[in-house]
Amino acid sequence: MIVSSTTDFREAARRRLPRFLFDYIDGGAYAERTMARNIDDLADIALRQRVLMDVSVVDPSTTLFGVRQALPVALAPVGLTGMYARRGECQAARAAAAKGVPFCLSTVSVCDVDEVRAASATPFWFQLYVLRDRGFMRDLLARASAAGATTLVFTVDMPVPGARYRDAHSGMSGPNAAARRLVQAALKPAWAWDVGVMGHPHRLGNVAPALGKASGLQDFMGWLAANFDPSIQWSDLKWIRDAWKGPLVIKGVLDPEDAKAAADIGADGVVVSNHGGRQLDGVLSSARALPAIADAVGDRLTVLADGGVRSGLDVVRMLALGARGVLIGRAYAYALAARGEAGVTQLLDLIDKEMRVAMALTGVRDVASINETILAERVPRAG
């Protein structure tokens, strides 16, 4: 199969993975309209083509949180990545390190912080959820820091899990889920051998101490649902700011007032995100929410964004809307599931090439020059 875009990686992932895993990557909340709008609203952003601008040298590199990187891109925290490919977090981290972009490890990863650091020998970002057990959170922060995590991405848009109907239909949850998953795995023998057999252990590495012997998928889902903390407030983040000495990024912000609150508690950045449309269906797409947030706090925080990014062209669009950098989640998960580390490497190379083409054809030579002036029309601010 020829792979030349994220769409191709998605199809290859669909063919390889059991349905419950593919739908877990591919699905969203409720009717999945916000998930679709993430893609559609970003694709509708028209760029202003310029000519005769001397774009003989185009440089897509940038600096985020004091670190120079090859692209204004980071691999977003994606849960259960080690189930998409054998020790998937390690494969993705190696690909990111080789390209010179950050990899962000999810709290709910198969490979833990120490295994990822050993695999890539490069500092990484770490993502943390809001959990009831503050002692466990403190221990996890300490482990991540000791393993070399430099930037903490604190996810705040999951006080409760979203309603993901597709998961119930596919066997990730719902009646007889375990039996349905076994049948689906048997129908995908290449995945079953490579990941199901050779990819052990399948425990959730970072939360294994809390789970104890109960480390199966259903155990994990139940533990996570029971440990989300809906009572947390902005004032509760002070101890996280005090505990984490590196850059702190608040992920899951869609409103300028929340972005201002993040700045007020001492955060270094925010991620404009609706969790890939996996939490509350009907909220703004990231592309629509981004400009107002960039206007409100762009001089106080590093504004990042995710949601609907499928190409280097989409990265340029997000930067033009006000982001300093972009997190890529589903796109790299598809690539990883399809071809492992080589797939993620190929995806990042595609994004690099697509960014360079888009920059050249809009007349910009460096990332700092990408702003609203390359848009064909002024984008209205939400709110």
UniProtKB/Swiss-Prot annotation:
Q: Where is the FMN hydroxy acid dehydrogenase domain?
A: 1-380
* GO MF entries: FMN binding; L-lactate dehydrogenase activity
Please state where this protein is localized: Cell inner membrane
The EC number(s) given in the record are 1.1.-.-
- Report whether Aminoacyl-tRNA synthetase shows up as a keyword of the record: no
Enumerate the active-site residues.
Answer: 275
Q: Which GO terms describe its biological process?
A: aerobic respiration; lactate metabolic process
Q: Which InterPro entries match?
A: Aldolase_TIM, Alpha-hydoxy_acid_DH_FMN, FMN-dep_DH, FMN_HAD, FMN_hydac_DH_AS, LldD
**What's in the keyword line of the UniProt record?**
Cell inner membrane, Cell membrane, Flavoprotein, FMN, Membrane, Oxidoreductase
- Binding sites annotated in the UniProt record for substrate: 24, 129, 164, 278
Classify the main location.
membrane
Q: What Gene Ontology cellular component terms go with this record?
A: plasma membrane
Per the entry, which co-factors are needed? Answer: FMN
Catalysis: reaction(s): (S)-lactate + A = pyruvate + AH2
**Which amino acids does the record list as binding FMN?**
106, 127, 155, 251, 306-330
Topology relative to the lipid bilayer, per the entry, is: Peripheral membrane protein
Please give the function described in this protein's UniProt entry. Answer: Catalyzes the conversion of L-lactate to pyruvate. Is coupled to the respiratory chain.
Q: Which family does it belong to?
A: Belongs to the FMN-dependent alpha-hydroxy acid dehydrogenase family.
Name of this protein = L-lactate dehydrogenase
The source organism is Caulobacter vibrioides (strain NA1000 / CB15N) (Caulobacter crescentus)
User: Source taxonomy lineage?
Assistant: Bacteria, Pseudomonadati, Pseudomonadota, Alphaproteobacteria, Caulobacterales
Originating gene: lldD
